[in-house]
């Protein structure tokens, strides 16, 4: 083994000293050794730092030997070095700073890199008490001129070449101007002698400067073991300047076109005359500018602003918008043209004003400012398409807008609906199938008193989720769903009135008395497949129940309604299964409501009572499942289908016989078997055979 240098030996002693001293509770520098390459370094003195003096001294190394450290007559100001001590929690933070800085290192701005360091020196930081040394910190200083960028940025304009013909940024790893970047072999600022130090560790790929590698399709490219089997069966003769990688790494952005305000849209593009489009169910609807899009809610709950609309797909979406975020600029409906068979369709747009914004806006805080003009926001958008065969004949758009303050805060609920109607459809009720129900279509319903009831409903909460602001949405066939809302109840609420109020809100969901058995049942003929809704009566709202007179507590409050719908498959039409409804039942669930108080019960503060509703579709098989191949081929062994049951031939000996104990049955069976064998042996053929064998043996 080679001998250790004095500097390495001293560093090892200081490191060992730094490891052992905290175990004894003595002061120690952490770390005990620092290799300094920047103008400033820091260390910490921990362990008994009270009444400790910290000082700095440069060490003069003679013939590779360090002098013995002493703690007498040391100063904080030592030549070009400055020592600062800052007390911290249970420690002292020691900062050593070089006064001259890096500006002194590079007086020549044209020099890109200097192989010789700017300063090489050894410093010793000592902690002492009453001239007695307690701890030492050894600092090895070696600072180069290009440790950091010291040059001013050039104000010259950089000419960016066209990347189609010349790679943009041929050396991406060249991050420092007028300085050599380590491991960047394409950096022109690196001297050959310096590049030799790291040329084996150069950055690879595009970051290392290989922005235009040679294509393996070129005949001049060298083949490797990783080339495909078909290469070089075909190759291309082309110069390196026409590399296919030019422009490959360019990802440009599309800048919007700003049209002048005086530009009119009365002119028609020649392409519009040939904009012919034929649709089938599920195809995206096209406009002259691209896809026809409407904000829609995704599966993750986010609102997609540019979701395409599919042909013959009705939908209803709800999006929540932050009022502080600027509303996106969308295409003006009047300027939109729908592509269809035979030309273009111009929509008919109707604007309406929204009322009662409190039901749509949550936390309606307004910051008033002088001279702030109101702004318009879109609350609802309704699109009605008229279609015939594979084309769109007309489009009616109804936009409901509201005027709010320019500094309105909170969130707003927006609704978007799309509906497709045939051209001969008028005010008649829309079918939900023909004849059976289609999945996702509303459940058809009616009221015998002639009320305008067409379906069952669930709540569609908005804003704060209160029942007073909740809208209604139809129950869709085959889709289990649940919804709810919050009802404000005071501490002095009358229980009878509370039950009546809750029952009234729950009855709004199921006002219908009959439900259509099929999707095309006639509303005018009650005998055309209409089923009466089976209702399980809710508790009497006016009944005198116990605890009903106590403030803040009401028993037997109906807060949940369950709608069970029995469905079945009733044949098929042209290979399509037809589903129908067999029965509908509604059932109420009650709870005991109690006012929830915090630290104190405030009489003027309302509590929130949650109301909920759920719908459940239960599928009942209309017929037995088709028998399998095993059931068809092996019915001869089925005792329930045949008069002769072979598996029960030895019934007393099988496990199905329970008349006697199992051991007794086995004993009787063995006895019966032995008697049977004896009877067979004593029969006439066996006796004749025995006599013949006996006579044959005598003759021999």
Curated annotation (Swiss-Prot):
Its main location: membrane. Residues 683-700 are cytoplasmic. Part of the tectonic-like complex (also named B9 complex). The chain crosses the membrane at residues 666-682. Residues 26-665 are extracellular. This is Tectonic-2. It holds the Pfam family TCTN_DUF1619. The gene is Tctn2. It is found in: Membrane; Cytoplasm, Cytoskeleton, Cilium basal body. GO terms for cellular component: ciliary transition zone; cytoplasm; cytoskeleton; membrane; MKS complex.
């Amino acid at each position: 083994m080679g001998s250790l240098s004095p500097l390495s030996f001293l560093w090892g002693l200081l490191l060992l000293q730094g490891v052992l001293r905290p175990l004894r509770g003595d002061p120690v520098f952490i770390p005990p050794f620092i290799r300094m390459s920047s103008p400033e370094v820091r260390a910490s003195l921990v362990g008994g730092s009270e009444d400790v003096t910290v000082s700095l001294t440069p060490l003069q190394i003679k013939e590779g030997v360090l002098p013995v450290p002493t703690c007498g007559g040391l100063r904080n100001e030592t030549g070009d070095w400055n020592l600062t001590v800052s007390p911290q929690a249970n420690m002292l933070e020691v900062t050593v700073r070089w006064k001259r800085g890096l500006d002194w290192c590079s007086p020549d701005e044209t020099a890109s890199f200097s192989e010789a360091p700017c300063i090489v020196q050894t410093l010793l930081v000592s902690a002492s008490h009453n001239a007695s040394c307690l701890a030492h910190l050894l600092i090895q200083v070696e600072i180069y001129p290009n440790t950091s960028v010291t040059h001013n940025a050039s104000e010259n304009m950089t000419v960016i070449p066209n990347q189609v013909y010349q790679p943009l940024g041929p050396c991406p790893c060249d991050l420092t101007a007028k300085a050599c970047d380590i491991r960047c072999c394409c950096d022109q600022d690196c001297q050959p002698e310096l590049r030799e130090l790291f040329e084996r560790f150069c950055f690879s790929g595009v970051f290392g400067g290989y922005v235009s590698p040679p294509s393996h399709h070129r005949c001049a490219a060298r083949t490797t073991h990783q080339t495909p089997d078909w290469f070089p069966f075909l190759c291309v003769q082309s110069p390196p300047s026409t590399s296919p990688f030019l422009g490959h790494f360019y990802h440009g952005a599309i800048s919007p076109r700003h049209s002048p305000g005086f530009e009119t849209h009365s002119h028609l593009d020649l392409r519009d005359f040939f904009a012919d489009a034929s649709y089938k169910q599920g195809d995206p609807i096209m406009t002259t500018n691209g896809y026809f899009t409407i904000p829609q809610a995704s599966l993750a709950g986010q609102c997609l602003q540019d979701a395409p609309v599919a042909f013959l797909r009705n939908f209803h979406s709800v999006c929540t918008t932050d009022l502080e975020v600027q509303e996106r600029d969308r295409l003006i409906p009047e300027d939109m043209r729908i592509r269809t068979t035979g030309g273009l369709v111009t929509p008919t747009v109707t604007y309406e004003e929204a009322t009662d914004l409190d039901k749509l806006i949550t936390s309606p805080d307004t910051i008033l400012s002088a001279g702030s003009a109101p702004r318009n926001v879109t609350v609802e958008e309704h699109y009605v398409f008229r279609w015939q065969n594979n084309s769109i004949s007309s489009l009616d758009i109804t936009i409901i807008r509201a005027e709010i303050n320019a500094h309105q805060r909170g969130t707003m609920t927006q609704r978007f609906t799309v509906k497709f109607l045939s051209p001969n459809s008028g005010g008649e009720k829309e079918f939900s199938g023909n004849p059976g129900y289609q999945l996702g279509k509303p459940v058809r319903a009616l009221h015998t008193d002639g009320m305008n009831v067409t379906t069952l409903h669930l709540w569609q909460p908005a804003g704060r989720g209160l029942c007073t602001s909740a809208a209604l949405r139809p129950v869709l066939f085959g889709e289990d769903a649940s919804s709810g809302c919050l009802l404000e109840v005071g501490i002095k609420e009358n229980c009878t009135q509370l039950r009546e109020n809750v029952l009234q809100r729950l009855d709004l969901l199921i006002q219908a008395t009959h439900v259509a058995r099929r999707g095309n049942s006639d509303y005018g003929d009650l005998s055309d497949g209409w089923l009466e809704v089976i209702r399980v009566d809710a508790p009497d709202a006016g009944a005198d129940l116990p605890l009903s007179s106590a403030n803040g507590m009401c028993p037997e409050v109906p807060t949940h309604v369950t709608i069970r719908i029995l469905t079945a498959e009733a044949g098929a039409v042209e290979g399509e299964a037809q589903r129908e409804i067999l029965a509908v039942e509604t059932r109420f669930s009650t709870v005991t409501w109690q006012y929830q108080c915090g630290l104190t019960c405030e009489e003027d503060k309302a509590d929130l009572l949650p109301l909920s509703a759920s719908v459940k579709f239960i599928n009942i098989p209309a017929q037995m499942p088709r028998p399998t191949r095993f059931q068809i081929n092996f019915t001869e062994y089925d005792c329930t289908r045949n008069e002769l049951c072979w598996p029960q031939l030895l019934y007393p000996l099988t496990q199905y016989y329970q008349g006697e104990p199992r051991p007794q049955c086995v004993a009787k069976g063995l006895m019966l078997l032995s008697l049977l064998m004896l009877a067979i042996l004593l029969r006439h053929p066996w006796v004749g055979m025995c006599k013949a064998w006996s006579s044959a043996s005598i003759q021999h």
